[in-house]
């Protein structure tokens, strides 16, 4: 069955994001074959794009620059941690901390190009003001099959003597801030639904509700080897 388009967005965890997306040597040492299936010989098919307009390829530096921008624009420090406040009815309400950098996992086709995903990112920026900072296409992740694939499985292929089912996806890292006001962009449920449709239209895929099991496995893989580290960004 063909993969349907979907994008699932979460607050960015800078430490695990960059290590996973860039396939750093440390990350590859940490993951271990039993915890994540990345096939190194397929990694040459991966592609990446870094937005040149922000002057730094490092998310940590960009995050710090956002904190400074928020302070200059609003006169207040950026609220990074979850906090509590009392509502009008006296009940305690938890308020999430600011998530200035967010990351989307976008399911793609085997022949999806970097240009396709860049077009998606550019359209998101035009419509909602969220700016793509980094884009990574990953075509080296998936899982090994126990034996041969089913007859209807047209995606799995052989690597050596084993059959591999790929999980083609892209990571799109967004700056979620309005740099004129120093405030976070606000997207509602309708906006997010429109984004799903936008992905299917641009990537020429059938629109689908996020296949959460597939998307969650990607997130879990991304943080599994770095679980002991403290995130640099709220998740």
Where are these predicted regions, by residue range?
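N-terminal nicking endonuclease/strand-transfer module with a His-rich metal-binding environment
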Residues: 1-235
């Amino acid at each position: 069955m063909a993969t349907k388009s979907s994008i699932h967005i979460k607050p960015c965890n800078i430490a695990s994001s960059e290590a996973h997306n860039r396939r750093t040597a440390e990350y590859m040492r940490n993951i271990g074959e039993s915890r994540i299936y990345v096939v190194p010989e397929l990694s040459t098919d991966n592609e990446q794009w870094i937005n040149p307009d922000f002057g730094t390829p490092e998310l940590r530096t960009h995050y710090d620059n956002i904190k400074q921008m928020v302070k200059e624009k609003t006169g207040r420090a950026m609220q990074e941690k979850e906090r509590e406040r009392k509502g009008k009815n006296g009940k305690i309400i938890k308020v999430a901390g600011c998530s200035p950098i967010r990351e989307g996992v976008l399911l793609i086709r085997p022949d999806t190009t970097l240009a396709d995903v860049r077009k998606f990112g550019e359209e998101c920026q035009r419509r909602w003001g969220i700016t793509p900072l980094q884009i990574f296409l990953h075509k080296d992740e998936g899982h090994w099959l126990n034996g041969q694939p089913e007859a209807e499985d047209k995606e799995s292929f052989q690597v050596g003597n084993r059959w591999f089912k790929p999980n083609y996806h892209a990571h799109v890292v967004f700056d979620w801030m309005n740099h004129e006001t120093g405030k976070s962009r606000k997207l509602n449920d309708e906006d997010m639904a429109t984004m799903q449709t936008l992905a299917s239209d641009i990537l020429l895929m059938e629109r689908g509700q996020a296949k959460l099991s597939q998307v969650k496995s990607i997130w879990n893989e991304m943080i599994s080897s770095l679980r002991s580290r403290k995130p640099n960004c709220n998740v």
